[in-house]
């Protein structure tokens, strides 16, 4: 988030913000071939549930005001307003290479 100098230097923790974590099966969709995404490389439910719960535990350890979450695998309707101008994409394969 922007600081007083309009630089992206502040975290949600710095600002006393909360977080909403929603599991999303479409998070891993390979679009390299064809017109439809492939989810073959996405984690299967037992591993995915463990990863989701580990992520929630880590979010709770970060000191945010609060961390709310949905139910893994549930059909949920979520309304949000993105405050852009950008979206951050994290590629765990790239992070692991560092």
Segments (PLM) and residue ranges:
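Compact, glycine-rich, soluble single-domain proteins
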Residues: 1-16, 29-41, 46-58
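Glycine/charge-rich, flexible interdomain linkers and switch-proximal surface loops
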Residues: 4-19, 68-81
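Short, glycine- and charge-enriched coil/turn segments that flank and shape catalytic ligand pockets
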Residues: 4-5, 61-66, 96
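Short, acidic Gly/Pro/Ser/Thr-rich loop/turn segments
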Residues: 27-29, 95
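Short conserved catalytic/interaction loops centered on acidic-Pro-aromatic/His motifs
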Residues: 36, 66-69, 98
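Short, conserved loop-to-beta-strand elements that form functional interface hotspots
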Residues: 49-79
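Short, low-complexity, polybasic intrinsically disordered segments
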Residues: 83-98
């Amino acid at each position: 988030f922007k600081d007083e100098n309009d630089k992206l230097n502040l975290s949600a923790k710095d600002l006393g913000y909360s977080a909403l974590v929603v599991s999303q099966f479409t998070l891993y969709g390979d679009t390299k071939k064809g017109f439809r995404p492939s989810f073959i490389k996405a984690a299967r439910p037992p591993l995915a549930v463990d990863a989701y719960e580990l992520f929630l535990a880590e979010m709770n350890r970060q000191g945010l005001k609060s961390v709310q979450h949905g139910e893994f695998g549930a059909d949920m309707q979520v309304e949000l307003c993105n405050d852009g101008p950008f979206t951050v994409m994290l590629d765990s394969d790239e992070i692991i290479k560092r």
